[in-house]
Structures are given as C-alpha cells and as structure tokens.
C-alpha cells in the first residue's frame, strides 16, 4: 500500500516530471536518428553486396549526418544530466547505460525513459552487428572489429 504523498513529494514529482518529459523527448529523437542509422547501415550492406560504390559513398554521407544528430542529442542529454539532482542523475545514467533499475519512483515518464533507452540500445546493437559483419568482410584481418 502506498503511503499518502506529502506536499513536498508532490512538488518534487511535478518538477521531476517536467525534467523527465524533456529527457524523454531527447531520447525519442535519439531513437529516431539511431533507427535511421540502422536503416542506412542495412542499405549500405546491400549496396556493398552489389559492389555499388557510388551509392555506398552517398549512404555513408547520410549516415554521418544522422550520427551528428545523435551526438547533438547526447550533448543535450549531458547538459540535462549535469543539472538534475544527484539521485535522479544516477538513475538516469544507469538507465541510459542499460543498467535498468526500477522506474516506479519516477512514474510514467520514468517508464517511458526506460523503454526508449532500451529500444535505442537494441537498435544500436543491431546496427553494430551489421556494421561489424560488413567491416570484417571488407577489411578482413585489418578490420576495426578484429579482437573486439
């Protein structure tokens, strides 16, 4: 059974709610850019299998633009993390790193952040698998991923 909320708890929850909503918006944008990077990586693998170097160069450029947008999202996240209370910062850092803790303390915004961070990590892992396979196929023993 939940204890009745004190006025201070309600005010903190509202303030955290606004912060968490903004962080969720950034994570949603990051997820969208990571999904596009994944799509472009898959497209690039297909272009490489057809030996279509012109298309590969164009796709690499588009992927680079999306990577820059992900960096911008990460920068915004870093700015938010540096301005939140230590307890919230620690929780957010763990969630973003994939070390998911309980989100019930942070309500529906917390659950959304956990879901977005998990989905982003899944897309990133899928993209890395495709990228690793392409890189090893092209570079062989000189692959960036050798011994990783």
Show the residue positions of the predicted features.
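Extended, charge-rich alpha-helical scaffolding segments
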Residues: 4-98
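Short terminal interaction segments
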Residues: 2-9, 92-148
